[in-house]
Amino acid sequence: MAILIGERPAQALWRDYLELTKPKVVVLMLITSLVGMFLATRAGVPWTVLVFGNLGIALCAGGAAAVNHVVDRRIDAVMARTHKRPLADGRVSPTGALTFALVLALLGQALLLTFTNPLTAWLTLASLLGYAVIYTGFLKRATPQNIVIGGLAGAAPPLLGWTAATGHVSAEPLLLVLIIFAWTPPHFWALAIHRKEEYAKADIPMLPVTHGEHYTKVHILLYTFALLAVSLLPYVIHMSGLLYLICALGLGARFLQWAVVLYRGTRPHAAINTFKYSIWYLFLLFIALLVDHYLLLNL
């Protein structure tokens, strides 16, 4: 790799490469993948699929994130939120990051092919390319609907977990994908409002930059309503029970409250608080799905 390891402590270099994988994002993805796995079967997930399947998904996601760092390094350098990232700050070279990304992706694919099935490997590869190439390389700079169109790649983990456990696609995991797909726009647009000036400086056509904050707030509100409706569908189709319904209603009502506060502009930090809550929303919603699933099995 084009990195002079001797110039920096190995521990610092290790942390830089770990940062390239966006570990916090990958952890949230793995939670949804795990839920997809456990919801797919009543018999339990084989430990090899559970461990190596999720590791393969995580490695591929980390590889895609590293490519994102490479492509966005000039954008990251002019944004306060990202200017200290390893490539933007010059601590890791583009060649080193791309090599790292390729190694992660190949290892991830090898694990998926060995311990799960070809369908999961292909779907994971499609998700990787969708995020790293289509979204990062094109959509992000081409349209203010970048998040909406590109959100499908980031919504795939529960489907990947499901297919890893079963070897086939069915309606239930697609519904989980739909939940994340509906969650993505209000999640990212809230951050885009908070970082509007930085996105404008970086010449990224995020919705608040191209259409203004009011327009974006209206769409956040509309998507949050849609998300609340979609999140109830697992109960409607008898995929989940009463516990999940109560959690989905409570979490969704709170998300909707933040969207209304953001729309009205009555609190100075509503945008970033909406963004932060959206992360907890998705985490808790999928945990509720999982707990409810095992509660139903024991009734």
UniProtKB/Swiss-Prot annotation:
InterPro entries: Protohaem_IX_farnesylTrfase, UbiA_prenyltransferase, UbiA_prenylTrfase_CS, UbiA_sf. It is found in: Cell inner membrane. The keyword Magnesium does not apply. It is a multi-pass membrane protein. It catalyses: heme b + (2E,6E)-farnesyl diphosphate + H2O = Fe(II)-heme o + diphosphate. One of its GO terms (cellular component) is plasma membrane. It comes from the Bacteria. Carbon 2 of the heme B porphyrin ring is defined according to the Fischer nomenclature. PANTHER family: 4-HYDROXYBENZOATE SOLANESYLTRANSFERASE (PTHR43448:SF7), PROTOHEME IX FARNESYLTRANSFERASE, MITOCHONDRIAL (PTHR43448). This is Protoheme IX farnesyltransferase 1. The lineage of its organism: Bacteria, Pseudomonadati, Pseudomonadota, Gammaproteobacteria, Pseudomonadales.
